[in-house]
């Protein structure tokens, strides 16, 4: 007879869902939008509610707000930001103001930028280092042209996280339908910019509703996060993937036995023994030593200010770039870029300007190609670009220029244009790609067929740059007649 065995069934507790890993690194953010949408008031309220305002500052704010108080009897929080005399007199923001605040979970660096059209260049400056953009919109007015301009500039500068802060919602009697229409319209516009990560929040910066504390008592229909809750969950821009980059700012020669190249590491890392290349010359050397103010370092990473010592005497000047030999930037005479025009005279077609990128300064001819239509998000052909226009241009250099695309490295992919006549900075720009001499955009794996006189080809093949990439090339020596036939057959494909 077989005995029955009763199995004990053990019920395991359900596994808890994996928790999202919170990014606790300091977050850099920018407030932008049209004039009088409440950017300075919002930051002032953030500082006030996160207890970032010291007692003496609070007393000064209460005193300076006398006679400026609103119907609620609240201080004028914007005064915490408007530091210039002209700003206080006009009640507007002109300069970029940086402020710091923190919560129990994270610290923040916020840039308050001007909304007026004539100060667009200051807004671009603030956006160039930000991880996230808070785009303010007056709930009564909806999306304006300057709103679209600021969103576009932020997107071009690589910001992919947006908070759509629909401010002054209290002045619309907390109109839910109006808020949802603004959020819908902006999401449609943002798709044309390639921006998909958008958090829309209805708020009253003056009253502090949905800023640090919930505004659900006034807006029971909104159950989303507050502004601070959203910021605490945002991510810092991911590290860019290019190799070592050092733009030489100064050649240090304190004595006959020492020669070092000073600058701030703009990408990647470096250590003694690494092979590097000097561009645009193409010379190769090894890193002998890395020196800082009072230390000899074992390595250096992006953001470090260093003096680099090489193992041999090479010709290096201010403006040259020292790069990892196995991860080189693009070098050439022609590049495509996107720019923001910053001066009333705009960009004249074919005019020669100074281009400054890092410590390098070169002559360049700028040819406008297209201008962004802010209302539609479409690009239209353009012969010139006037103040505040966002455009695509072609850059042509007399001597080889060296860049990374901006989306790969912000430091080595950005530049400003300087008018040689007035010395004004007339545009800021971002490199999108290299153009070959045949007019095509440089792409990974693309081949270029050139027909050169034999003596010129021999000079090119004798260079160190060519030698370092010899295994990537194919050389065929042919007669002039054969070259003409090859060219005729290939031209239609180039």
UniProtKB/Swiss-Prot annotation:
Pathway: Sulfur metabolism; hydrogen sulfide biosynthesis; sulfite from sulfate: step 1/3
Region: G3, residue numbers: 112-115
Subunit architecture: Heterodimer composed of CysD, the smaller subunit, and CysN.
Reaction it catalyzes: sulfate + ATP + H(+) = adenosine 5'-phosphosulfate + diphosphate
Coiled-coil annotated spans: none
PANTHER family recorded: TRANSLATION FACTOR
GO biological process: hydrogen sulfide biosynthetic process; sulfate assimilation
Membrane-spanning ranges: none
EC nos: 2.7.7.4
Keywords, alphabetical: ATP-binding, GTP-binding, Nucleotide-binding, Nucleotidyltransferase, Transferase
Entry function: With CysD forms the ATP sulfurylase (ATPS) that catalyzes the adenylation of sulfate producing adenosine 5'-phosphosulfate (APS) and diphosphate, the first enzymatic step in sulfur assimilation pathway. APS synthesis involves the formation of a high-energy phosphoric-sulfuric acid anhydride bond driven by GTP hydrolysis by CysN coupled to ATP hydrolysis by CysD.
Sequence positions that bind GTP: 33-40, 112-116, 167-170
UniProt keyword annotation of Nucleotidyltransferase present: yes
Residue ranges of domain tr-type G in the record: 24-240
Protein name per the record: Sulfate adenylyltransferase subunit 1
